[in-house]
A protein has these predicted regions:
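Catalytic core of pol beta-like nucleotidyltransferases
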Residues: 1-14, 22-24, 39-129
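Short glycine/proline-enriched turns and hinge-like loops at secondary-structure junctions
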Residues: 27-30
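Short beta-strand->loop micro-motif that forms the acidic, two-metal-ion catalytic signature
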Residues: 33-36
């Protein structure tokens, strides 16, 4: 089955690779992070079937549904994504802009969480001495 047929069967309009393989930094045993977006809601069974179908093209697929991804994960996907399939031209570029915007909207909250965690770790270190 071709990537296009997989996309048609599951109403996928976007398939991208991200993570270490997309960055060219994979090591032996690295999985292949694949993010997909469907025009319909994907069930867990759909996700497992998509991952199994894509295993014919990529080793050890770890599948992510873009519609269910957190802003932090969207930022990671958008940062180093490599296009595998897009139903129409420019959809990939539109996704990268969307992912960046979602991440940047979340970033102030993420920064506050990091600062709070750092303060808690610093306080713990001081108590340990």
């Amino acid at each position: 089955m071709s990537v296009e047929k997989i996309a048609d069967e599951f109403s996928l309009d976007l398939i991208v690779m991200f993570g270490s393989r997309a960055r060219g930094q994979s090591i032996r045993g690295s999985d292949t992070d694949i993010a997909v977006r469907s025009t319909r809601t994907l069930s867990r069974d759909d996700e497992l079937r998509i991952a199994a179908a894509l295993d014919a093209f990529f080793p050890d697929v770890d599948l992510c549904d873009i519609r269910k991804a957190s802003p932090l994960l969207l930022g990671a996907i958008g940062q180093d994504a490599k296009l595998i399939y897009e139903r129409r031209e420019s959809l990939f570029e539109e996704f990268k802009i969307f992912a960046w915007n979602q991440y940047m909207d979340f970033k102030p909250q993420l920064d506050r969480i990091r600062e709070r965690n750092k303060a808690e770790i610093d306080a713990f270190d001081e108590d340990s001495e």
